[in-house]
């Protein structure tokens, strides 16, 4: 549970610490706005994707399923600034599939907390393997990190790409290549 009162007080302290007047017209409501925003963007804390991935549908095919270009927004746990991009999820069902929107909800659960892109990638893959009992999962995440864009090295447009493979994707190079080809279509 997010403690909005602590966030408000902390935000006031930060504004004062950087030399701002917390009673200035444009800043008076900022601590409250930040508290409400944090409640939304950190809503994945303490959650897992089980509730979204538990309702499945029988299929008579074990062919590859790919949901690509799922937009995500998250907060870098090192600097608490945004990183955002696209997630591509491929899985091989084991007789059961999940509604496609549930894959996007899975991404939401794990992206809405202080996060590392590497961990985001593996948490998505592990949850799909576990809750869908998939034969294999491949997750590719492309992200732009504001901690590299607006501070430090200041390299706007630089993308970080992370991948992880589970099950059949560990064994079959041509399967991975098929997914990369479909992602680039």
UniProtKB/Swiss-Prot annotation:
Its EC number is 3.5.4.16. GO terms for biological process: one-carbon metabolic process; tetrahydrobiopterin biosynthetic process; tetrahydrofolate biosynthetic process. GO terms for molecular function: GTP binding; GTP cyclohydrolase I activity; zinc ion binding. It catalyses: GTP + H2O = 7,8-dihydroneopterin 3'-triphosphate + formate + H(+). Toroid-shaped homodecamer, composed of two pentamers of five dimers. PROSITE patterns: GTP_CYCLOHYDROL_1_1 (PS00859), GTP_CYCLOHYDROL_1_2 (PS00860). Zn(2+) binds at residues 76, 79, 147. This is GTP cyclohydrolase 1. NCBIfam families: folE, PRK09347.1-2, PRK09347.1-3. HAMAP family: FolE (MF_00223). The keyword Chloroplast does not apply. Transmembrane segments: none annotated. Belongs to the GTP cyclohydrolase I family. The gene is folE.
């Amino acid at each position: 549970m997010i403690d909005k009162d602590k966030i408000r007080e902390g935000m006031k302290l930060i504004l004062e610490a950087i030399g701002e007047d917390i009673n200035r017209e444009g800043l008076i409501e900022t601590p409250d706005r930040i508290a409400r925003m944090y409640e939304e963007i950190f809503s994945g804390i303490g959650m897992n994707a089980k509730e979204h991935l538990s309702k499945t549908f029988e299929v008579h095919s074990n062919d590859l399923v790919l949901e690509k270009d799922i937009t995500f927004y998250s907060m870098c746990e090192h600097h608490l600034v945004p990183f955002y991009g696209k997630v591509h999820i491929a899985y091989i069902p084991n007789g059961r599939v999940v509604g496609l929107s549930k894959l996007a909800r899975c991404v939401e659960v794990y992206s809405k907390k202080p996060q590392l892109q590497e961990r985001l990638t593996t948490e998505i893959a592990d949850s799909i393997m576990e809750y869908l009992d998939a034969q294999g999962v491949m997750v590719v995440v492309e992200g732009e990190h504001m901690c590299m864009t607006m501070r430090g090295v200041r390299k706007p447009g630089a993308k970080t790409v992370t991948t992880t493979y589970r099950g059949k994707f560990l064994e079959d190079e041509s399967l991975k290549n098929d997914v990369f080809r479909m992602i680039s279509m």
